[in-house]
């Protein structure tokens, strides 16, 4: 539950920051707005344009490092969620029972749910 709340807060923060970024982008038509945009771009090197290929590669490495950090965090989260399965938390890969593959209705995705027409098809043998 705590992880769900954290994810919701993270998404709310990201959407708020993107809305704020769009609002500051609309000021770019007048001279004051463009000066503010240039000031912001000079302070954030990630958004600055690279004049040579060497600088461009260094920015790509930073993005790659961030992606690997996010990937590592995701792997750790998935491992923790798998370990915490019996405690009542959501299990990422549930243990599903194995069914007979030769049965004529072999795709049983809806365990415990009545899929329309399937139950009646299992109960009655059709002669045709």
Swiss-Prot record:
PTM statement from Swiss-Prot or TrEMBL: The precursor is cleaved by proteases to produce a number of active cholecystokinins.
Residues making up the propeptide: 21-108, 120-128
Keyword tags: Amidation, Cleavage on pair of basic residues, Hormone, Secreted, Signal, Sulfation
The UniProt record lists the keyword Signal: yes
InterPro entries in UniProt: CCK-like (IPR015499), Gastrin/CCK (IPR001651), Gastrin/cholecystokinin_CS (IPR013152)
Expressing tissues: Brain and gastrointestinal tract.
Protein name (Swiss-Prot/TrEMBL): Cholecystokinin B
Organism of this sequence: Xenopus laevis (African clawed frog)
